[in-house]
């Protein structure tokens, strides 16, 4: 017997009962980004593998272990994008969007792919909303990105469940000096490091700071701190960011071990984390990458951005019971019609109502059925009200209006007054 077809492990279907919450989240973010002057860009989900090797770094876990890479019929090595920044930078360069030093504030949404071990809040296909800003190099734009997310958390009702962590990685020069000091310190404690950290010490020493191993964490307590190696420019930038966050009343903590998992970051890095989701606590993260555009073949261009994980934020909304009640309801009004003449009239009447109330979610019963069966479907739909049209109502040019979720008797409404009545009861609440 052949194996039944099913989704690939770690790549999940988003079912009809889940999509209203996704649409609510996505539209809430999109409105906020419009208000802040960000423009949407859409990139392919497949890029040349070399793009990610050059941007993310060949000795990162993502490139070494996690990318979905394949060879196409032309012999080109292609990769499903594991993150969005590199693809966005490629698009900006290819289409000359930052020519002449022109600032760009962009955002994107879509699936990303990493071959990780699936668990709650971590998937092999996951969705992100990302923001990228080019040709603005001051701490003010770093602050705007963080202020924007703080406002979003307020709109979503999750501010009390998230915490902002900050660090500065400095310039490549200061980071190089720090790397030398860190390697010297860790090498003196090599026997106390876990196996993965010993490997990282040789390939990407700063990533040792991100270890989850308790023994290695104990070694890191007395390790050199990046803050002691910052150049004046990076220190001034970081102080400017903190001053703006203080002025905006946004609480934060300095995490000297925050380094991020991608090689292109410099100066500011930040993460929004929560303790409500277990091990997968990072819901939004980003930072500055002033050298990335030049590294990818462009002219020197500053950049800063972040990405938020949609699955994790939706999981957080559900965990905190911050899902608006109306999100779970996909139908406002359910129209039941009995008899062929009534069915024809119901179709015409419903379209007239839609003309006048374009935001009304009106569903007509399909498949005929008895009064009992149609009314059962009306109740199961979650609609607030049922409309009832039979031969008697049709003869009088009225339609029955019955509340399904609260008190109230059924009443008859004239055809020409139906839209106004629904506007009062449903659209206006």
From Swiss-Prot:
One of its GO terms (molecular function) is histidine-tRNA ligase activity. Gene3D superfamilies: Anticodon-binding domain, Bira Bifunctional Protein, Domain 2. Keywords: Aminoacyl-tRNA synthetase, ATP-binding, Cytoplasm, Ligase, Nucleotide-binding, Protein biosynthesis. One of its GO terms (cellular component) is cytoplasm. It comes from the Bacteria. It catalyses: tRNA(His) + L-histidine + ATP = L-histidyl-tRNA(His) + AMP + diphosphate + H(+). CDD domains: HisRS-like_core, HisRS_anticodon. It holds the Pfam family tRNA-synt_His. PANTHER family: HISTIDINE--TRNA LIGASE, MITOCHONDRIAL-RELATED (PTHR43707:SF1), HISTIDYL-TRNA SYNTHETASE (PTHR43707). Homodimer. NCBIfam families: hisS (TIGR00442). This is Histidine--tRNA ligase. The lineage of its organism: Bacteria, Pseudomonadati, Pseudomonadota, Gammaproteobacteria, Pseudomonadales.
């Amino acid at each position: 017997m052949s194996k039944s077809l099913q989704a690939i492990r770690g790549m999940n279907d988003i079912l009809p009962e889940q999509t209203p919450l996704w649409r609510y989240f996505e539209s809430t973010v999109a409105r906020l980004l419009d208000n802040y002057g960000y423009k949407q860009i859409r990139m392919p989900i497949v890029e040349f593998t070399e793009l990610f090797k050059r941007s993310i770094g060949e000795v990162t876990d993502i490139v070494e272990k996690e990318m979905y890479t394949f060879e196409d019929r032309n012999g080109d090595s292609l990769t499903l994008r594991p993150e969005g920044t590199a693809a966005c930078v490629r698009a900006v360069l290819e289409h000359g969007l930052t020519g002449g030093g022109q600032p760009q504030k962009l955002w994107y949404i879509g699936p990303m792919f990493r071959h990780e071990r699936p668990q709650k809040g971590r998937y092999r296909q996951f969705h992100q909303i990302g923001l990228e800003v080019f040709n603005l190099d001051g701490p003010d734009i770093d602050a705007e990105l963080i202020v924007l997310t703080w406002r979003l958390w307020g709109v979503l009702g999750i501010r009390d469940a998230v915490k902002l962590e900050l660090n500065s990685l400095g310039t490549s020069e200061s980071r190089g000096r720090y790397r030398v000091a860190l390697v010297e310190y860790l090498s003196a404690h090599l026997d106390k490091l876990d196996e993965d950290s010993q490997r990282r010490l040789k390939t990407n020493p700063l990533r040792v700071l991100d270890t989850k191993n308790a023994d290695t964490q104990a070694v890191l307590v007395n390790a050199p701190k990046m803050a002691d190696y910052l150049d004046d420019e990076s220190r001034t930038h970081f102080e400017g960011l903190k001053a703006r966050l203080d002025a905006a009343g946004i609480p934060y903590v300095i995490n000297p071990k925050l380094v991020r998992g991608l090689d292109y970051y410099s100066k500011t890095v930040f993460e929004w984390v929560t303790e409500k989701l277990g091990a997968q606590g990072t819901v939004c993260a980003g930072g500055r990458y002033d050298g990335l555009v030049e590294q990818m073949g462009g002219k020197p261009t500053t950049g800063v951005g972040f990405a938020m994980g949609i699955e994790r934020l939706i999981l957080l909304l559900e965990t905190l019971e911050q899902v608006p009640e109306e999100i779970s309801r996909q139908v406002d009004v359910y129209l039941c019609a009995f008899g062929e003449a009534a069915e024809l009239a119901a179709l015409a009447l419903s379209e007239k109502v839609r003309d006048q109330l374009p935001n009304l979610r009106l569903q007509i019963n399909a498949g005929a059925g008895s009064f009992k069966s149609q009314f059962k479907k009306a109740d199961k739909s979650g609609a607030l009200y049922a409309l009832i049209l039979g031969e008697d109502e049709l003869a009088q040019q009225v339609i029955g209006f019955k509340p399904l979720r609260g008190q109230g008797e059924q009443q008859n409404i004239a055809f020409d007054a139906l839209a106004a009545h629904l506007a009062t009861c449903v659209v206006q609440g």
